[in-house]
């Protein structure tokens, strides 16, 4: 189903993006890898090409218009069309919203939301002209369940939920399908990136310091149930290969459980369950 399809994957140098690129290449797709880390991209591209796959590595920053345009141009020059886009690039940050600088919050939205929209705006007209295409947005369980001390990142994923729903309705008449994939906890470099981005906020946490200590302790426990990147890559492949894809794919199992409980239980229960606690 995916053989010879040309698919762009952003954030392809590690984690979910890398696993997705590998899985799509195995399925016979022409995979275009996009991320900032040029050396990692080149190594992955060379590895996949050595097995007879057709790939293209484009190093760039998704927040830069020139890099987004170069990505689309390079893809068309090599493969002649774009059949699908996997919007995976993004990062998280943690800490009390009161202490997060507005420029840091804007930067998070720039990468996770606005750049995704901007790249989609470049690709959607091409798909409309073809009369077919598919866009898969990588959201998060955090787009449905906001945790205290994670509201900056979680709010970007809430925004993505609305954008995906709107795009789905707008592009469907033109044969373009839009799908959301919601990962739960996944073992990737995502947590390390969030720690780096949030370091200054943690250092100046003030009255929130003890709550952040508990938050980190609890987060470490959740790693025990975390899935692996290929759990999500498998869902992305399903979303791309299905003739009639679902609106949303959730995974792994713990993500489905949390979302079911969110649907089943009253909001006051979640406020209680997710309340901030101090480290002992």
Predicted regions and their residues:
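The beta1-alpha1 cofactor-binding region of Rossmann-like NAD(H)/NADP(H)-dependent oxidoreductases
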Residues: 59-70, 102
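C-terminal beta-strand-loop-alpha-helix "lid" module of Rossmann-like NAD(P)-dependent dehydrogenases
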Residues: 172-223
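Conserved glycine-rich cofactor-binding loop
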Residues: 13-14
């Amino acid at each position: 189903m995916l053989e010879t399809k040309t698919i762009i994957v952003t954030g392809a140098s590690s984690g979910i993006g890398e696993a997705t690129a590998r899985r799509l290449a195995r399925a016979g797709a022409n995979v275009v890898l996009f991320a900032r880390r040029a050396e990692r991209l080149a190594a992955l591209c060379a590895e996949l090409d050595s097995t007879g796959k057709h790939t293209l590595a484009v190093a760039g920053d998704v927040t830069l218009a020139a890099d987004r345009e170069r990505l689309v141009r390079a893809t068309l020059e090599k493969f002649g069309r774009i059949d699908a886009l996997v919007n995976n690039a993004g990062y998280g940050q943690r800490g009390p919203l009161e202490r997060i600088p507005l420029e840091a919050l804007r930067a998070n939205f720039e990468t996770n939301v606005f750049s995704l929209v901007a790249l989609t705006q470049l690709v959607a007209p091409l798909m409309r002209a073809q009369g077919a295409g598919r866009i898969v947005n990588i959201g998060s369980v955090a787009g449905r369940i906001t945790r205290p001390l994670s509201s900056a990142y979680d709010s970007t994923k809430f925004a993505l939920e609305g954008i995906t729903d709107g795009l789905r309705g707008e592009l469907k008449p033109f044969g373009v399908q839009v799908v959301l994939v919601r990962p739960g906890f996944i073992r990737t470099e995502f947590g390390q990136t969030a720690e780096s981005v949030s370091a200054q906020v943690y250092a100046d946490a003030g009255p929130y310091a003890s709550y952040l200590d508990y938050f980190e302790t609890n987060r470490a426990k959740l790693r025990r149930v975390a899935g692996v990147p290929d759990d999500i890559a498998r869902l992305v492949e399903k979303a791309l290969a299905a003739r009639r894809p679902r609106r949303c794919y959730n995974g792994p199992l713990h993500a489905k459980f949390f979302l079911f409980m969110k649907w089943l239980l009253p909001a006051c229960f979640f406020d209680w369950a997710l309340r901030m606690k101090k480290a002992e």
